[in-house]
Amino acid sequence: MLMITSFANPRVVQAFVDYMATQGVILTIQQHNQSDVWLADESQAERVRAELARFLENPADPRYLAASWQAGHTGSGLHYRRYPFFAALRERAGPVTWVVMIACVVVFIAMQILGDQEVMLWLAWPFDPTLKFEFWRYFTHALMHFSLMHILFNLLWWWYLGGAVEKRLGSGKLIVITLISALLSGYVQQKFSGPWFGGLSGVVYALMGYVWLRGERDPQSGIYLQRGLIIFALIWIVAGWFDLFGMSMANGAHIAGLAVGLAMAFVDSLNARKRK
């Protein structure tokens, strides 16, 4: 699959896709922040891009409208929903994204009811040698959050970045990034502060690093992160390291997570180039 272009206007993208269908080229539309056009048969990429250039010069050409009539797509392509916020949540998040979000919320509620310490006894990084074979602990520390702001901040980024990775690269890729970054960021953080920590931020930083570098080195992957946001992430790490806001931050997890994401993106982008 090759992403050809993105359109902000669904009417325009549908007209182009319908026209190409009349020319024997099948394109698909994926709705994210914009309407992304994907081509399954990459051997036709040059032809599609040439036609796209002609289309952009005059999208109102009668032949494009005629193609839409022929395909039966004369509507706006817009679907108005009563609850656009929840529709946006659903469209961007795949099953793994949802499972992790729900797990974090359930654990957060349990911590409010039972207390932080009680839940940490079951989910925290192994704090005693006898617990080292309770393998879930190397990952479940990422599900624990200690304030409403903590969980909201992490889940917003998880939904935004994790959802993009899952939608574009598949659930398997998101699972691999999540497990590796949770394990390694947790290992580094326990070296910094001991086993009593929690939060999804190590995984979030891994996703930030991955999405940014993969988008820079492999634009055809269809994922990207604005450079301003990765700069924000670096500033936040520096602020946490020097305790500029007086907040307790898992600095080791943040740095390790970012490094893991960058490393995985570098390897994946190299592999993508070799396949071309």
Curated annotation (Swiss-Prot):
Leading EC class: hydrolase
Keyword tags: Cell inner membrane, Cell membrane, Hydrolase, Membrane, Protease, Serine protease, Transmembrane, Transmembrane helix
Keyword Protease (UniProt): yes
Catalytic activity of the protein: Cleaves type-1 transmembrane domains using a catalytic dyad composed of serine and histidine that are contributed by different transmembrane domains
Main location: membrane
Residue stretches spanning the membrane: 94-114, 142-162, 169-189, 192-212, 229-249, 250-270
Pfam families for this protein: Rhomboid (PF01694), Rhomboid_N (PF12122)
Superkingdom, taxonomy of origin: Bacteria
Location in the cell: Cell inner membrane
SUPFAM superfamilies linked to this entry: Rhomboid-like
GO molecular function, one term: serine-type endopeptidase activity
EC number: 3.4.21.105
GO biological process: proteolysis
Membrane topology: Multi-pass membrane protein
Active site (catalytic residues): S201, H254
Family to which this protein belongs: Belongs to the peptidase S54 family.
Full protein name: Rhomboid protease GlpG
Native organism: Shigella boydii serotype 18 (strain CDC 3083-94 / BS512)
Organism lineage: Bacteria, Pseudomonadati, Pseudomonadota, Gammaproteobacteria, Enterobacterales
Gene (name only): glpG
